[in-house]
Amino acid sequence: MRWLLPLSRTVTLAVVRLRRGICGLGMFYAVRRGRRTGVFLSWSECKAQVDRFPAARFKKFATEDEAWAFVRSSSSPDGSKGQESAHEQKSQAKTSKRPREPLGEGEELPEPGPKHTRQDTEPAAVVSKDTFSYMGESVIVYTDGCCSSNGRKRARAGIGVYWGPGHPLNVGIRLPGRQTNQRAEIHAACKAIMQAKAQNISKLVLYTDSMFTINGITNWVQGWKKNGWRTSTGKDVINKEDFMELDELTQGMDIQWMHIPGHSGFVGNEEADRLAREGAKQSED
């Protein structure tokens, strides 16, 4: 009869774990992509696997079977309920924000869908707040600009803004005006902020691989304005009009400017770059 004891304990444990989810005494946290994948019984355990992990995928379930099905599948299990949180963020970013705990019964965020080409540039209708990814209370967005033959007569520049997989606000368009890489980076950020304001979003975490844009808007612009839009050496600011527009757009916004290495495998940055390159192929209006 001794051999029955381990089996009895195993069965009892399985029943207890199942009851934890059903009775609301606990939930099952499934991590599909993180430092460790699997099913965890507490948010703190789950958070340790996904916090600051690029493109982490995790979701909360009421039953262990559903949780494991999510871990093993490439898309959400049919009929499953929960809320997945997708954080495509730079792992070495210095910020006090942390991924939020999934809120329980709700729809899973979509997996990456077909790649989008140019989006309608008309003002977008207000979209559900649930379609965005968050870092704390701030909405996450990735921007990028590109320019082929930069500095030459045949230069073609585009801007890309990426809000998430299959998001209706994802956009890739041709840069109007002077075709340069730096202008494209600045105006990609401008486009993202304009879109955010149209959605009544006031808090952003904006990822860009352009330190020029970040330094310009967070450090240099105040000195330029004091000097009559001249550099510390007395020269005219080359991208004066572009930074003036960006500076005006940031008023009333709470923006965390985050640098992310370009072409380093971070999904959000790669998608923003793809959109920018598609935009550069378009004709100028």
UniProtKB/Swiss-Prot annotation:
GO cellular component: mitochondrion; nucleus
EC numbers: 3.1.26.4
Region named Disordered: 72-126
Known function: Endonuclease that specifically degrades the RNA of RNA-DNA hybrids. Plays a role in RNA polymerase II (RNAp II) transcription termination by degrading R-loop RNA-DNA hybrid formation at G-rich pause sites located downstream of the poly(A) site and behind the elongating RNAp II.
Keyword Cytoplasm among UniProt keywords: yes
Cofactor binding, per record: Binds 1 Mg(2+) ion per subunit. May bind a second metal ion at a regulatory site, or after substrate binding.
SUPFAM superfamilies in alphabetical order: L9 N-domain-like, Ribonuclease H-like
Name used for this protein in its record: Ribonuclease H1
Protein species of origin: Mus musculus (Mouse)
Complexes and interactors: Monomer.
Keyword tags: Cytoplasm, Endonuclease, Hydrolase, Magnesium, Metal-binding, Nuclease
Catalytic reactions on record: Endonucleolytic cleavage to 5'-phosphomonoester
Domain RNase H type-1 residues, every copy: 135-281
Gene3D superfamilies documented for this protein: Ribonuclease H-like superfamily/Ribonuclease H, Ribonuclease H1, N-terminal domain
